[in-house]
Amino acid sequence: MRSKLGTHFKKASVISGSVTQSKVNQSTFSRSIIGTSSRKSLNLHAESKMGERNLSMVSKQSIKIFDDDGKDVSPQPLFQAEPGTVPQKQNKLFTPPDASGIGASDIFSSISLQHTAFNASFVGPFTRSTFGASTVSRSSKETESMTEDIEETGFKREIASLSEIQGKQHEMQPTEEDLDKIINIFLTDTETLWLLDMPPALTATDSENADLVRVRNQAYEDLCKDKVGNDKYIERMMQTFSGAPKNKEVQCDRIILEDTGVMASVWDLYDSYLSPESLPMKEAVDRAIETKNISSSRLSESRGTQSMNSLGRGDSFSSSIADIERLALTRIPDEVEPDSEEILKSEKFLQDLFFMERVVVENTFQSRLAAYRQLPVIADPDEDEDKISAMPSNIVSPSLNRLWSFACDVTKGHNVSSMSWNKKNSDLLAVGYGQFGFAEQKGGMACCWSLKNIMWPERIFHCECGVTAVDFSAVHPNLLAVGMYNGTVAIYNVQNNEDFPVLDSSDNPNKHTSPVWQLKWIEHDRGNLGDDKGEILVSVCADGRITRWHIRKGLDCNDLMKLKRTGSGKSKKSSNEKERKGEAFISRQAPGMCFDFLPKDSNIYLAGTEEGHIHKCSCSYNEQFLDTYRGHKGPVYKIVWSPFCPDVFLSCSADWCIHLWQQDVLLPILTFSNTTNAVYDIMWSPSSALMFGAVSENRVEIWDLGVSIIDPVIVNEANPGVKLTSILFAKNTDCVLIGDSD
């Protein structure tokens, strides 16, 4: 029986400056211990990419590698010896030039150190114990054949000496030139790695939703448990069909593109650049003086410590400061005291005053303006709380509370004759000022008031005589028609602040010769007047004519109707027959006092006369009246069609009465009389079909036919010595405007 002990060891050497790593591979050493003859075999195999020769044994040398900065970057050994083991010695085995000096003790010591590795890599498959404790179960022939195969593989390679390897190591060390070479490193994109990230939704245990989250989590866990082995839940595959897209054609407005350009010259850029840098004279001079003081202090310090060269630099610095000061003084103009008259007359100052005045007025009258517009009132912090608490909280009966008065020093003492709202801007009010009596005539005016400034009118148009009627155009809201006591009809443009009309009838041969008591813009859209479609101006005058005005090169007119006097129907003869005949001949035409067109048919209108009659007329026929409504005993001052019921109208007269008429009935349906004074003006409410307002000489009456047809629901007495003249309801609010003689 022959036993063999095989030992396998492996060593690695690192060569500086070379990318190739040499490996001293497996060597097998077999020796028989029992028997007369012994056999020694040691194979050393070396594998290299460069085709290096085999080595018997290479002594392990510690080689250090340093980088360009002098740092030690030598690789650390992969094998860590167990504590207590003896360091391995370098052996030179069976190499012709280096074979001297090798003893048997060196060989056996190296064999014993690598015995563990040998058992693990080579003998491991053939034994169960370590350090040769077990015998090989294979036959000696199989073992010898395996050893011969290993030896044949090793002898096929050439054997290289250790001195040659050391020489190669020395030759492959980098030189200074190699270290100074520039190495190009190319960076390329690597493949993108997608990592699934599903952030969890965490909820604090002490939050408000913690209980709800716990319940949902528990329900989900129960559902997952119930699904396993439950017949209620089955897996089923489905396919979702998405609808096929459809192409549709649509139309849109043409997209209009416009190109705009602005040219800026060099001087514009220069001025714009310097404008924020312009400073007042005092600030610039202070900066120049401060700079000069700093320069003088620096110059004094430099003279005490530096040479003549430094003095020269200080002199140049001070001279440059002087140049800067002269430049600042030349660039900054002399301060000129502004002229107060120029400031007061400047447009910018007037515009600033205009806006500032509006802001102050709106802040002062905020509560009243809010009540007018039916908005919540902001409490004044400076107002006494006792006064607020003393105000009644609930008002049982309806009443009128005064908000403010459109009055100023210019309008003080003038009689309000007419009022009209602008058709487009409901905040703009036109008021005419003039006297009604012939002996009381004086200069009149027409003013345009705005709710944004109730203390002063926006426009003031002075007239030679008193203004008796005003009205805004609906088609052209900037045109204001004004009728005067001397029969003149004028048209003003409220967009301009000029105090003269753009058109008037003073040069027209067919102008009115008596006071124009009413005028109104009428829209004719039914084509009954031929070429005169659109908006026309109609006026009624005390000379007995109802006239239509056209705006062409000037104001041209033609008569719609001449109001003729009508008898009472009874002819009585008396001794004064000649006197009555003469009177009838002189006053053949009845003075016109008012008119109003039918809302549903602009070709039909009513005209009130000084006789007390109301005539129904047509624009297509001017020879005679269509109908005559008799009921008043005095001059008819106002006629108003109902905005809700087109066949009903109201009329007021100097006979203290207000009549309610129906178009098909020639006698009044209702008569309202609650005063002993003449009723000057009436108007329907724009918000209620049964409510209207009336103004007599000393009181304002608000009637509600749904409450009472005998007495008005609201009565407000005028101040002593003040006569009320006109009434006008405000639009979109529960307010009414009253004109008086003050």
Curated annotation (Swiss-Prot):
GO terms for biological process: cilium movement. It is found in: Cytoplasm, Cytoskeleton, Flagellum axoneme; Cytoplasm, Cytoskeleton, Cilium axoneme; Dynein axonemal particle. Plays a critical role in the assembly of axonemal dynein complex, thereby playing a role in ciliary motility. This is Dynein axonemal intermediate chain 4. Disulfide bonds: none annotated. It comes from Xenopus laevis (African clawed frog). WD repeats lie at residues 462-502, 511-559, 631-671, 674-713. InterPro entries: Dynein_IC, WD40/YVTN_repeat-like_dom_sf, WD40_repeat_dom_sf, WD40_rpt. The keyword Oxidoreductase does not apply. One of its GO terms (molecular function) is dynein light chain binding. Keywords: Cell projection, Cilium, Cytoplasm, Cytoskeleton, Flagellum, Repeat, WD repeat. Part of the multisubunit axonemal dynein complex formed at least of two heavy chains and a number of intermediate and light chains. Associated with axonemal dynein subunits such as, DNAH2, DNAI3, and DYNLT1. One of its GO terms (cellular component) is motile cilium. Gene3D superfamilies: YVTN repeat-like/Quinoprotein amine dehydrogenase. Pfam families: WD40. The gene is dnai4.
